[in-house]
A protein has these predicted regions:
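N-terminal low-complexity, acidic/polar interaction/targeting segments
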Residues: 1-248
Length: 248
């Protein structure tokens, strides 16, 4: 059986290719970062980022409190501060499906980045000992592709340009108008990260079982949102995740 993947629950899903900086301050997650830094191989410095269902507590409810599909994050940079916190930079790597979750006692706990907050930031306040680190058995998911992906990608890219124009630049993305990726899978994840939609819909995109399915869902969402913004002046008021979409 593979080694359990340490989990870092957040209030929004990560996607593959997304650059996610984090300020690690809770003891359990500081210990997790140190554990990753002790790994001699860069590719082994991996932990799981998964979104928590609204109003749920993953420590008490386990998998029931978490969405089924998350994304592993690779630790790219880490700086330990004088007070013991870590400033780290991670990149979304590969999707996984939760099989089981177990709280493992540790001397470490949490982090946040901008609008992205830990799933249970106040949980440690009333505990006599540090909250445990969640570790999960997971199944890593392959990304199915098909011949229809290229056509769908062209359609989604066109709708994404219209959507960004309607929003008036509110979509955070590091790619310019003429730099939208041609790779269908990369495009599907860029749109997943950049759209201003509720968490459940972003999770639906992430959980799609193929690039074609994700692009098809994204195409519909982009069309819907562009109409709402353009015709009803209904600009979304949702916060955009405090992370940087990357086409790498």
């Amino acid at each position: 059986m593979p080694e359990p993947l340490p989990l870092f629950p957040l209030n929004t899903p990560l996607v593959p290719g997304l650059v996610l900086p984090l300020n690690i301050f809770e003891p359990r997650y500081r210990a997790m970062v140190q554990e990753l830094l002790d790994e001699p191989r860069d590719e082994a410095r991996e932990f799981g980022v998964i979104a928590i269902r609204e109003g749920r507590d993953p420590l008490r409810e386990g998998t029931e409190a978490l969405y089924a599909v998350g994304v592993s994050a690779l630790l790219r940079q880490a700086e330990e501060l004088e007070d013991g916190r870590f400033e780290i930079v991670t990149t979304g790597h590969r999707r996984f499906r939760l099989i089981s979750v177990e709280p493992v006692p540790t001397g470490a706990a949490g982090a946040h980045s901008g609008d992205v907050t830990p799933a249970d930031p106040d949980h440690d306040a009333g505990l006599a000992s540090p909250a445990p680190l969640l570790r999960a058995q997971v199944e890593f998911l392959a990304e199915a592709t098909s011949e229809s992906d290229a056509l769908l990608a062209d359609q989604v890219a066109a709708r994404f340009r219209e959507y960004r124009s309607a929003l008036g630049g509110q979509v955070q993305a590091t790619v310019g108008e003429d730099e939208i990726p041609h790779d269908p899978t990369v495009l599907s994840y860029l749109v997943t990260a950049a759209m201003v939609v509720p968490q459940q819909e972003r999770q639906q995109l992430l959980s799609a079982d193929s690039t074609a399915a994700r692009l098809t869902i994204a195409r519909g969402m982009l069309s819907r949102e562009t109409v709402l913004i353009s015709e009803l002046s209904a600009v979304p008021s949702l916060d955009i995740p405090g992370a940087t979409p990357s086409v790498n």
